[in-house]
Amino acid sequence: MKKISLTLLILLLALTAAACGSKNESTASKASGTASEKKKIEYLDKTYEVTVPTDKIAITGSVESMEDAKLLDVHPQGAISFSGKFPDMFKDITDKAEPTGEKMEPNIEKILEMKPDVILASTKFPEKTLQKISTAGTTIPVSHISSNWKENMMLLAQLTGKEKKAKKIIADYEQDLKEIKTKINDKAKDSKALVIRIRQGNIYIYPEQVYFNSTLYGDLGLKAPNEVKAAKAQELSSLEKLSEMNPDHIFVQFSDDENADKPDALKDLEKNPIWKSLKAVKEDHVYVNSVDPLAQGGTAWSKVRFLKAAAEKLTQN
């Protein structure tokens, strides 16, 4: 009788454990969403076979993908470090990440150790670098061109199962753009606005569809200065050229990391008599770091933030 009771007790405990295991498995399944499987993904006319959805993503070189991850709340397995650390801008998504190297200096050995399902690299990398990175796993070179911002975000959304969220972000941006564009046209339609970036103590301007210009001129429709229209890439400018353009509004982007050798470059600029003579300066229409200075300008995150800043700054008296 005792043997039967003991057997029943063991059986009961086994069934309870199985039930708990099943429940935990079910909970884990719900938390992870759809079961991962190999799928073919189309991105900029190329096909990649990847495991989706996945959070085993290593980002190297593509700050654009880091910004998309921030907007979609994706926490990658590996992320780009800046001067050996993750900057505050990305602290909310790098809590589980290991560094994959600096922006243009990928650590291939470290990425290999991670064994990621997919590596998001950058089209800025030379072909030889991309070949080396691809030895660590399936590698997708993510475009650094502003006009591909939607495709870039949808790529990460497909990899992580967040397509619905990405589509809503795009739809919300386009709706906000319509409303803000109307307000700006009423207030600043004929105003001249310029975005400059200070790097290594020098002043740079960008082509009409590059950096934040893609939003300022491309989306909002403000007229680009001739110097911006003529620029073919990041272009060194000067105070004398700024004086010739004499914009009504100036957006200044200044990062300490990019001016480590000349930390007082912005202060020195602001003291310069030519700078002080500019219309935008006289009218207090100079906006320093209205968006985080590490932002790439042509991503969904950058566009959403810059649109908000432009709406505020360009419609003020």
From Swiss-Prot:
GO terms for biological process: iron coordination entity transport. PROSITE patterns: FE_B12_PBP (PS50983), PROKAR_LIPOPROTEIN (PS51257). The keyword tRNA-binding does not apply. Induction: Repressed by fur. Induced by Btr in iron-limited conditions. It is a lipid-anchor. The keyword tRNA-binding does not apply. Pfam families: Peripla_BP_2 (PF01497). Disruption phenotype: Strains lacking this gene show a reduction in growth stimulation by the catecholate siderophores enterobactin and bacillibactin. GO terms for cellular component: cytoplasm; membrane raft; outer membrane-bounded periplasmic space; plasma membrane. Its main location: membrane. A lipid is attached at residue 20 (S-diacylglycerol cysteine). Residues 1-19 form the signal peptide. Belongs to the bacterial solute-binding protein 8 family. Involved in the uptake of iron. This is Iron-uptake system-binding protein. It comes from Bacillus subtilis (strain 168).
